[in-house]
Design a protein with these regions (language model features):
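Binuclear metal-dependent phosphoesterase catalytic core
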Residues: 21-30, 107-171
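His/Asp/Glu-rich metal-coordinating catalytic cores
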Residues: 1-127
Length: 176
C-alpha cells in the first residue's frame, strides 16, 4: 500500500499481479493462465512457490517467479518442476540461465547491472505450447564485463602494467 504502482494508471494491455499471495489471470485468446505475486516488503524469506499448483491444466500455465536466494523467496526447483507449469519465468538473478528439463529460466538482465555481472547478457526467446517448450538465449548487451587474469611482478612499473592491460583489453575486443 502507498506504492507508486498503486497510484499509477496502467495501460489497458498491462495486467498487474499486485497481491502478496500468488494469484492468476487467464488470457483466453492465448489459452494461457499466468500466475505471480508482488513483493510488499523488501525481503521475503518464505518459500512462496513451494506449494503452488496450476488450477487450469487445460491451458498453458506460466508462473512469473521473482526470487531464488535465502532473502528473496527461496526456490526449490524440484518442487516447482512438479507443480504442473508449462514454463516458469524467473527473475532476480542477473545471470541468464535456461533449464529446459525443469521448464524454467532466469532471464537475467539485458545489460550488465554492475561489474559483478560477468559474461553475456541478453534475453530469452521462447515458444510455449501444451506439446512442449523451446527456449533460446539471445545475446543483446552492448557491453560485457569479463574477468582478465593478470600477473603483476614486483619489478613492473605502472606504465608497463598499463600498457599490458590495454593490450589485453584490445585482444578481447575493445568495443565491449
Amino acid at each position: 500500500k502507498g506504492s507508486f504502482y498503486d497510484g499509477f494508471k496502467w495501460s489497458e494491455n498491462v495486467i498487474f499481479l499486485g497481491d502478496k499471495n500468488i494469484e492468476s489471470v487467464e488470457i483466453p485468446e492465448l489459452n494461457t493462465c499466468v500466475y505471480g505475486l508482488s513483493y510488499h516488503q523488501t525481503e521475503i524469506k518464505d518459500a512462496m512457490y513451494d506449494h503452488v499448483i496450476v488450477n487450469r491444466p487445460d491451458m498453458i500455465n506460466i508462473l512469473v517467479a521473482h526470487g531464488g536466494d535465502e532473502k528473496h523467496i527461496p526456490i526449490n526447483r524440484k518442487k516447482l518442476a512438479m507443480s504442473g507449469f508449462d514454463y516458469v519465468a524467473m527473475g532476480h538473478i542477473h545471470k541468464p540461465e535456461i533449464d529446459e528439463k525443469m521448464k524454467m529460466a532466469y532471464s537475467g538482465s539485458l545489460e550488465p547491472i554492475d561489474m559483478n555481472d560477468i559474461g553475456p547478457r541478453g534475453y530469452i526467446y521462447g515458444e510455449i505450447s501444451k506439446r512442449g517448450l523451446e527456449l533460446e538465449f539471445v545475446p543483446f548487451a552492448k557491453r560485457i564485463y569479463r574477468e582478465l587474469d593478470f600477473t603483476v611482478t614486483p619489478t613492473a612499473t605502472n606504465l608497463e602494467i598499463r600498457h599490458r592491460l590495454i593490450d589485453m583489453i584490445k585482444e578481447q575486443g575493445q568495443d565491449d
